Every structure is written in structure tokens, then in C-alpha cells.
Amino acid sequence: MRKIIDITALSIAVCVLVMVLFWPSPVLSFKCYRGDGVSCAQLGRDKLSRGDYDGAKFALSKACEAGEKDSCFDLGALYDGEGNATQAGVFYTAACDKNVAISCHKLGNLYQRGRLSRDFAAAARHYIKACDLGYAKSCHNAAVVYFTGGFGLAADQAKAVSFFERGCDGGLVDSCYNAGVAYDKGLGAPQDRDQAEKLYTKSCELGYGDACNNLGYLYVSKGDLRGFSKGLGWVKKGCDAGNKKSCQIYEFMKEQILKK
């Protein structure tokens, strides 16, 4: 009888401890304690919003174990923010394995920046997966590591250009610009000024001043007044977008017109 009472008392104590740990969400706490992943995920987010990071870690880890993939990412991000790259990598991997694109991207960041180990091959692998899942920033980052190479990855400018184009398709202005440069200069792709013009135009129209400058130069280099006039217009667009270099080039081009 005494043993039964002791076991009951212990069970009550555990329940009370759980309630206290997860207060002020006792219902979620109870459901989470019983293994309900959705409740653990909700509880973890609640704890995060209240600044209770230890409670959040406990709840999110249970949610992650129960198959809540977004909680795996949230937990990875929490550890990442604390500077614990090793634990961040564990939970980013768990979420990436469940096709959470941003988690694959963050994992690629850890490898690219050397916070786990500096391994561009691993970074590229995770960026490509995130890119394939529709995360445009990862397409851009995959292009960057392929363009430079190193740290276990052979440079491949042709691959870099293809990923810059995919990033551009996803609306990233710097990807459009870099793809434009590749076609303009013949880096990793056949030199194609018409294709460069299209890519620069898209980037410039999205507010990327350097693309406006390069587009302006393409028109000016045609050597006729109409081309110069169009080029001036694109450079002015870069200036209007706040690009100081564009403004300087614009003023210089206007001076050239006045001298003629």
C-alpha cells in the first residue's frame, strides 16, 4: 500500500513539475507531456515568444521527435542564435531531411562559413537541395560556391551560371546581375550581349544600380546617339534608385553630351 502511495505521489509530483515548467499553458503542457507533437510545437512557440528559451528547447525537441519538422528548424535556429553551431546543425539536418527548404539553406550556411567545418561540397549539396525545393537564395549561394570553388569543391563556372539564372528566376536581383555579367564577359557561358541585356534589364528594373550601369554601358558601346540616349536613361534609373556610382556616371555622361 505504501509503495502504491509513493508511486502515486511521484506521478503527481512529475505532473506538477511539468505544469510549472510549462506554465502558463497547462493544457498544452499536459498534451505535450502525453506525446502530442502539435501541442509541443505550439507550446514551444509560446515559450519562445515569452523569452523562455529553456522551456522552448524542451517543448520543441519533443515536437521534433514527434515528427513536427518545423519545430526541428525552430530548435536549430534557436541554437544557431546562441552560437551553438553543432546543435544547430543537428536540428537543421533533421528538418532538411524532411524537406524544410530554409533548414537546408541554413545548413549550407554553416558549412560555407566554416561554423561546422569549412566544406563547400557539403554547402553546395544542401544549397542545391534547398534550391530544388524552391528557395531562391540557395540557388544564388550554390552559384557563389561553384564560381569560386575550394574547400572540397571544384570550381565550375558553367554550373554557377545555371544557378545564378535559377536565382534570377526566383526574383533575386543580384543573381540576375551576376548571370548578366557571366553572359556579358563570357564567364562560364558563351558571350551573349543580348542575353546579358535581358538579365541586366530585369535586375535594373528591380532596383539594382550596378545592373543599370552595366546596361547603360551596353547601350553606349553601340556607338550611336540612340544607344547613348538609352544608356543615359538606364544609368539615371540606377541613380534614382539611390546608387551613388550610377549618379556619378550619370553626371559624367551629361557632361559629355554638353561638350558635343
Regions found by a protein language model. Give the residues of each.
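Structural motif corresponding to the intra-repeat A-B loop/turn of tetratricopeptide repeats
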Residues: 50, 82, 114-117, 154, ...
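Terminal, low-structured helical/coil segments at or just beyond the last alpha-helical repeat
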Residues: 237-260
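N-terminal Sec-pathway targeting helices
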Residues: 1-12
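Short helix-capping/linker turns of helical repeat alpha-solenoids
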Residues: 35-36, 47, 66-68, 98-100, ...
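TPR-repeat structural position
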Residues: 37, 53, 85, 120, ...
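Hydrophobic face of amphipathic alpha-helices that form TPR/SEL1-like repeat modules
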Residues: 42-49, 74-81, 106-113, 141-149, ...
